[in-house]
């Protein structure tokens, strides 16, 4: 093999080789498909089988999966446009810490890109033989430089490439069916340069701007060490090794080469060169092979031996292949595939190659690390290089469906491209505990909590709402608090409804921790911005926190006052009393407008001092009903501040609520339940008002969401809040043990994002809701999830199992939900 770089010129997404071939290159947008969804995976493979059948006549192909830079710092910089001004320092610090901690754990932060190259059919291009000969003659005598001798060469190249525009346009339309997009000229430059700087330090932007072949190939490649190549660039040096695919199982189904390679604990490349075999070669070769196998079987039988199992299997496969290639669309494809690993030392590189071989062996794929063919493989895998008749070693022969089984351009991406770190993808593998699941993953998850209604390209939803469900103790509240911590850094007004009244307790412990105060002052200063409201009627400071007179505008205040009082007093048939009540309400609201310190309790006082005895008695009754009850939260004299709508971060604690069961009839409500329902109306109105400012983004977290689903009033409140979310920039985080709490028929499309922790009694419903197939394997997968693991369905409709992790030790105290006792640590200590 002549070891020469095939590339001669680049024009847009086209590459011209020394031999006069023109290749077109496309980036294939990856698809995230859970491997547990067998039907979706098979459907995807069928689509690629049909693609290869459609483009078989193009003859030569190049599949490439490579680890591109994730550019996390750049993504966090873009995220800063959403950060609140008063949280910029703390957000920037934690984003920098995220980058540092992830790089410490993973090394280079990468994501896999997928490139498909196709050699264009020159037979379809109208180029005079003389022009092509002139160009090839020029290339054979001229320097390798594309730009230095720009004058004539560039002009010829451009006119030459223009001849291919029509045939490339046809191919580009076919590529669109698998989400393929043309590479730009700078991307083409980088894809070629990448092969010479793989695993070495380099700046993608700088390498993409190179304009001549000599600079693109400006790396010393030293093949003197067996099994590896030593690469020296102008910035760095390192080692690469090409691990070649040698054998598959007879049945290649579910070999999933490209997908399997992604789950390795370090970044790798997968390169595959494919060439269509002419049927005029395939048919005689199969006939000859079949004849040989027949003679082998005859010979074995003549000596009294049974036919070898391998001989019988081979004969069956040959017969099957002969039947298959009778179909017009089916061809044999010859292909050569390698996994490329990198390392700073030869030892590291060979060690990674060994791990690759062991890992793929588990998927039924046998690999080899060639000792003396590393340089040949390096040049064979360059863009524009094709297989030829001299390539005999490690060539695989399959039909198009065999190539499709490699599962090109599928990954396990989930979440958003810009956002905060939330955890790790778990590719549905079995682990001993949560920590091992986290440590075995390279796929980290970013999440931006407020993107769904931003008209994202490719998004499957316009709903900003989020559902977090699962059994008690699996991590719902932990996840909700983690997201709330991140949201508190965004320029979003946030409200967390905390019925267990636990957040303040844990946060206060963090604020009182001398070590954290001394070492993490930015985080302490941020936590001190949290505003707490406690709905506890036993605390006099909370009286009037939800008084409509205090926090609502006049019209809405009057309406809500009526609703609250009607919960505990029947005005029907008592027009005089009702008139006095309404008049007193108007007078108190007018007084409030004039700046006087008044509240709903003043309505009762006015009724008590009314000249009519019936009104006085009604006032006395209402006073007794309100006295020492939960209604003190809604009915007070205005001396305490109401819930603040001005604070950016509010935690609203709810205590001592006595709400009826959702199936209970209204006439069976106890007086205590009626009072709690009245408070629910007030709470809902506050949330509704909270989310109704179109000039600002707002979010509410509703922990223990049974509060809103146990009464008709609560359901009404919650539905109204969600409608506000669709109309305004408002998102609701609904945190509940039961998926059924949230997923009524009319509500199923109302949640754009969902996190589902395991709930043994609802696995089937959860799988359906999360776009997962309801199978035994998937139910078992849910059963085996650890505390802190959940299914995550994102804005794009993708679903994956993820392990939640908070990277920052100082945050853990504020995210706690239970106190771990000494005996629990002792339990874990013993083998």
Swiss-Prot record:
Any keyword Nucleotide-binding?
yes
Does the entry feature the keyword ATP-binding, yes or no?
Answer: yes
Kindly state which keywords UniProt assigns to this record, in alphabetical order. Answer: ATP-binding, Nucleotide-binding
GO biological processes: unidirectional conjugation
Region of interest: Disordered: 285-311
A Gene Ontology term for the protein's cellular component: cell pole
The cross-references to Pfam families, in alphabetical order and at most eight, read: AAA_10
Q: Note the InterPro entries from the entry.
A: ATPase_SAG2001_prd, P-loop_NTPase, T4SS_component
> Which residues bind ATP per the record?
470-477
Q: Which domain of life is it from?
A: Bacteria
For this UniProt entry, the molecular function terms from Gene Ontology, in alphabetical order, are: ATP binding
The name on file for this protein is: Uncharacterized protein YddE
Native organism taxonomy = Bacteria, Bacillati, Bacillota, Bacilli, Bacillales
The protein's gene is named yddE
